[in-house]
Amino acid sequence: MPARTSPRALPVRTPDTPRPKIAYVLPVYDEADNVAPFHAALTEATAVRDDLDWEFLYVNDGSRDESLARLLELRRHDPRVGVLDLARNCGHQIAVTAGLDAAGDADAVIVMDTDLQDPPRVSLEMVGLWEDGADVVYAQRRSRRDTLFKRTTAWAFYRVLDRLASVDIPRDVGDFRLMDRRVVAEVARYREQDRFLRGIVAHVGFRQEALLFDRDERHAGTSGYPLGRMLAFAANGILGFSTAPLRMITRLGFALSALSVVMAAYVASVRLLRPEDSVPGWAFLGVGMFLLAGLQLVMMGVIGSYVGRTYTQVQGRPLYSLALTARGEHSGVRSLPQTPPDLRTQHGSVS
């Protein structure tokens, strides 16, 4: 953990001085049963800091249930609630990005999920560390109450990523973190289509501190990250911050070449010195051919993954489109259900 920095220089408070603003970016996907209890826990936790202005910015990631209706109901009762509704399901990382883009005017931004696995009270400790001078405070899991499969795969992923990544990405850390506005502004410059935000934040730098916490169980519902999405997310982390798979292909090629030289020398020596013991070896030859063909296809797949990421990136498509925005005490709900697709994309997209 980095050494504690000097306290953050906050403006001298006068009756006309605005209070520091802390914005929560809260991605939501099929969390209709969790929205109300989460918001109640969050407002209770933040009520102890009435010296700060709070904004609760929920980002609906194309939920299929009643999540959007529940969020708009929260907004009717709490003007601090903002709602962004993505035009389609773009994934957790893009939803967080949309929230960060919208919350860039805050002094600090806290990203957390809405399933109550990340306790809202921990975010208040993050604010304290931010006031002490940290630019990024990431919540590091001391323990987690997940299934054995989830714990095992997460443990393996973070260790593999730690060995392969070109930047120092903390282990056992998700997206639950606080970022100073300077960090948020820098993260906004990273527009990768295949996003791995915890790697991006690590790459940005600044003063980063860990905050240990115990992760709870989900309050209700099931995880929005099935096995397929977990594997894709892991691939984004490895391919986005490491060229080690490409280097492994080169090393494997040299190793197989060396092995083929040894095998050729062995076959030649047997043929010359003990011809009566030589065997045609068609079975061995067939197995070897299939093995090499399989390895070549795997290598092409790895190269293709990098090429595919490059192709997706150079297309320059917007990361997301907004179908609805509701923010601030005086902002109304802006929905675009009848707008033609081309105009809708221009009006609601951030590239």
Map each language-model feature to its residues.
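Structured catalytic core of nucleotide-sugar glycosyltransferases
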Residues: 2-147
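Hydrophobic helical membrane-anchoring modules
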Residues: 2-18, 198-351
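Conserved amphipathic alpha-helical interaction elements at protein-protein interfaces in regulatory
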Residues: 44, 48, 73, 77, ...
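Acceptor/aglycone-binding surface of glycosyltransferases and processive sugar-polymer synthases
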Residues: 82-102, 117-200, 216-228, 232-235
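A generic fold-level signal
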Residues: 17-19, 51, 103-104, 171, ...
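Residues in soluble alpha-helical coiled-coils and helical-bundle/repeat scaffolds
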Residues: 29-33, 117, 121, 188, ...
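Short, hydrophobic secondary-structure boundary micro-motifs
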Residues: 54, 137-139, 169-172, 247-250, ...
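Short conserved micro-motifs on helix faces and helix-strand junctions that flank
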Residues: 27, 86-88, 177, 250, ...
